[in-house]
Amino acid sequence: MPWRNGPHTRPPGGDAERDRLPRAIAARLIRAGRLADVPAASAAAGLAPGRREPPRMPLGQWSREVFELVEWRRFEAVVEALFGQAGFETRSQPHGADGGVDIWLHSIHHADGDAPVSIVQCKQWMRWKVGVKEVRELRGVMAQHGIARGQFVTTSDFTGDAREFAAGNGIGLHDVDGLLRLIATRTPEQQQALLQVAFAGDWWRPTCASCGIKLVERTARQSGRIFWGCENYARGCKTQLPVRYQARAAADKP
């Protein structure tokens, strides 16, 4: 599963493209006293470009800020681990078309042990509420697979129409506040384990949804614009994300 990454290590040679945090994320952590700026003068100079050592665990407890900092794949990994702590066997697709399902939930108590008992859709949105359209789409996938229960998890909120539709169609909704309340019911050890999932590996660098690999920071030749690009560009992957929207840009669109 995607969250089972090894411990974070700096690439040999200090590759600036890989060990530099997006400026918006670094600025936030430096001002909060959670990140030591490697060239010390850069913070005093208004966070001028410079290499920064990514923190292994920038936050020690759960809050909305965790979901604002980590990339979309880390968010989905936390959701998967959270359901795993509840006793479900989970299965996820690391990349590529997911058919509307981010996580499959299986139960050892189900008559057919191989059949999923529920499916989960995740949206790491920050600026928009999840609407009835997205919830209807999940219901359609449930019907396609003959599954009676579904779960929709988001880092934002749901519209009133979405909540009304979900209530009558076997779909559990988990907004950011509900997600944090659910995490708070876990033991301190389990909560720390979930934080380790959230901040595993290069938690600030977005994952290519098509290839399943980490995007790298690129600079456009003509405009000088900095963006996230896929290392498989030469092989045909055109995935690009604007750095200014941080790692969550991939999922922060309706």
Regions found by a protein language model. Give the residues of each.
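Mixed-charge (Asp/Glu-Lys/Arg
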Residues: 1-99, 104-254
